[in-house]
Amino acid sequence: MACLRPLQVHNLKKGEKVNFKHYSNGDVARYDMNKNYIVNDSVPCRKCVGCRLDNSAEWGVRASLEIKSNPKHNWFVTLTYSDEHLVYNALGRPNCVPEHITKFIKSLRKYFERRGHIGIKYLASNEYGTKRMRPHYHICFFNLPLDDLEKTIDSQKGYQQWTSKTISRFWDKGFHTIGELTYHSANYTARYTTKKLGVKDYKALQLVPEKLRMSKGIGLKYFMENKERIYKEDSVLISTDKGIKRFKVPKYFDRRMEREWQDEFYLDYIKEKREKVAKRTLFQRQIVSSRSYTDYLGDEQKKLNNIVKRLTRPLKTGKK
């Protein structure tokens, strides 16, 4: 993916705060290059659908690397409310309650810590159902040793799901399902922030916005143990439901290495190389499409919006 509304950086010197000029016409950015400031470069806006899809893919990669560090006890957990435990806002709409999921995760981790098991991590999101806007939560748990799994009915595509008395003990507000954690389910959890309503919509409906919550350092252990090879190839190989795929190095790892790597010029070289490749790819796509840069971004926005509309729940949550 690529940013569909890149921001122009101008008059930027090393160490100075970044200033932006952003002129928009609808959903597509248009830049007035005749202004009396010097435009040096462009940076991602981090808000458009392209940036949000890139961000969700990065979380999928980081989750997959965390699984590689701890191959056992990784689960995709869905928590739902029973009718009597739904919390309604002033407009009579069922609402997510962040304190509920925070308390659940803290209680679960303390339970295992008292039994000598530490190092449980998570990636969680709150979400509203597509049809009835019913609140529920998805949590990717890493290194969570559930030993009381009970098999439930198979999903409609033939993959196994479970329940756990341990999960029920700490989530007493409704129901839950457990599946095997994969790149697909982690990416799906992160993509809920891509499907979100606009800020004004949440305020108008008085709903808690959909948001990601996570532990620190997801995927960091594997990265630190393999960083030389990863940067040599400048990519990460991940097993997905469509086979082995090559992904970009998550920006989180770049920021980490900027603080820790002594050879900062090497990292600058890698970033410059990436930028040249990205610009060349963009130029080639424009040539093929025979459209202006602005029109090209508009077309890409429409394509990505259609992708977001088709996002579905990952039924591949554990093979039989």
UniProtKB/Swiss-Prot annotation:
It comes from the Viruses. GO terms for molecular function: ATP binding; DNA ligase (ATP) activity; endonuclease activity. It catalyses: ATP + (deoxyribonucleotide)n-3'-hydroxyl + 5'-phospho-(deoxyribonucleotide)m = (deoxyribonucleotide)n+m + AMP + diphosphate. Transmembrane segments: none annotated. It holds the Pfam family REP_ORF2-G2P. InterPro entries: ORF2/G2P_dom. Its EC number is 3.1.21.-, 6.5.1.1. The active site is at residues 188, 192. Keywords: ATP-binding, Endonuclease, Hydrolase, Ligase, Nuclease, Nucleotide-binding. The keyword Phosphoprotein does not apply. The keyword Nuclease applies. Plays an essential role in viral DNA replication. Binds the origin of replication and cleaves the dsDNA replicative form I (RFI) and becomes covalently bound to it via phosphotyrosine bond, generating the dsDNA replicative form II (RFII). In turn, viral DNA replication initiates at the 3'-OH of the cleavage site. After one round of rolling circle synthesis, protein ORF2 is linked to the newly synthesized ssDNA and joins the ends of the displaced strand to generate a circular single-stranded molecule ready to be packed into a virion. Belongs to the microviridae Rep protein family. This is Replication-associated protein ORF2. It comes from Spiroplasma virus 4 (SpV4).
